[in-house]
């Protein structure tokens, strides 16, 4: 429609230009010299056809460019609509706990450069790796695959909080295959990306929760790992249970009951701080959390065991 309207606007100009050329030819047809440039009538008359051909060629070139623009814009709109449709399907499958179907859907677009697709691919690959039926060999491949998707997402758009979050998660996951030195060194990178994700989106409870896990992990680091870290690094990463608790509570304030593991870790952190009353409060909430995923079921079991110990 846009191209047709442009064509109709252009045609009167072409007809007007053609008439002007013919008028010039007739007025200068006496053979006398005319105007500053001194054209002879015969020269103008002789070149009329060539001029019209040139004008027509220019018009067609213009229309070709206009066609290209319209088609390109339509292609972009179509591609954007298609990506949004895929994302809607992906989010529905994720919320429904359809881990394998989600992975099958997204891997069809693994060559995409869309950041929203890429970080979801990282998440889906990681979720498949976490399934009980996934072999250790397959798990390793999937975790490195997830890291590659997250890395591409981050390279594509450094202002995406989700790309920072999943890049940090995936680096943490592959740490088990990299050795203690690399794992500790990566801790600085992981913390940096979690903090960046929180900065970019302070309302994302998951990023805040993950920062809490980072603190909890280094607060309970075994003494021998701490000793290795002190040997390898002048300032090894460290944290406290109090700091971890702060992040877990902050995540809960942003989005109450958003994640069963956050409830569990609130209980476990209070246990580490010898506050059994508050530990029991949060462990009961974790045990009662509706089990939508395999992880939720595992958390229910762990919470029940910890409550029995109390």
Swiss-Prot record:
Keywords: Cytoplasm, Cytoskeleton, Microtubule, Repeat, TPR repeat. InterPro entries: RMD1-3_a_helical_rpt, TPR-like_helical_dom_sf. The modification N6-succinyllysine is found at residue 165. The keyword Cytoplasm applies. One of its GO terms (cellular component) is mitotic spindle pole. Pfam families: RMD1-3. The keyword Cytoplasm applies. It is found in: Cytoplasm; Cytoplasm, Cytoskeleton, Spindle; Cytoplasm, Cytoskeleton, Spindle pole. GO terms for molecular function: microtubule binding. TPR repeats lie at residues 168-204, 222-258. Interacts with microtubules. Belongs to the RMDN family. This is Regulator of microtubule dynamics protein 1. It comes from Rattus norvegicus.
């Amino acid at each position: 429609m846009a191209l047709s309207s442009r064509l109709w606007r252009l045609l009167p100009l072409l007809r007007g230009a053609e008439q002007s050329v013919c008028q010039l030819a007739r007025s200068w047809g006496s053979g006398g010299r005319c105007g500053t440039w001194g054209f002879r009538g015969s020269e103008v008359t002789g070149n009329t056809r060539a001029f019209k051909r040139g004008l027509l060629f220019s018009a067609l070139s213009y229309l070709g460019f206009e066609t290209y623009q319209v088609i390109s814009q339509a292609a972009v709109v179509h591609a954007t609509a298609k990506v949004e449709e895929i994302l809607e399907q992906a989010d529905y499958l994720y919320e429904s706990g359809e881990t394998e179907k989600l992975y099958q859907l997204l891997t069809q677009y693994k060559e995409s450069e869309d950041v929203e697709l890429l970080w979801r691919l990282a998440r889906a690959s990681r979720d498949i790796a976490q399934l009980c039926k996934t072999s250790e060999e397959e798990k390793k491949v999937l975790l490195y695959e997830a890291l590659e998707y997250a890395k591409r997402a981050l390279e594509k758009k450094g202002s995406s909080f989700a790309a920072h979050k999943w890049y940090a998660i995936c680096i943490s996951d592959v740490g088990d295959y990299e050795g203690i030195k690399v794992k500790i060194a990566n801790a600085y990178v992981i913390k940096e990306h979690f903090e960046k994700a929180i900065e970019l989106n302070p309302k994302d409870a998951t990023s805040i929760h993950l920062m809490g896990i980072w603190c909890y992990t280094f607060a309970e680091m075994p003494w021998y790992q701490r000793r290795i870290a002190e040997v390898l690094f002048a300032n090894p990463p460290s944290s406290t249970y109090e700091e971890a608790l702060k992040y877990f509570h902050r995540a809960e304030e942003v989005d109450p009951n958003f994640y069963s593991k956050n409830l569990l870790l609130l209980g476990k952190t209070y246990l580490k701080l010898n506050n059994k009353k508050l530990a029991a409060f949060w462990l009961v909430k974790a045990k009662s959390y509706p089990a939508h995923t395999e992880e939720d079921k595992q958390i229910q079991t762990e919470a029940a065991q910890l409550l029995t110990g109390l």
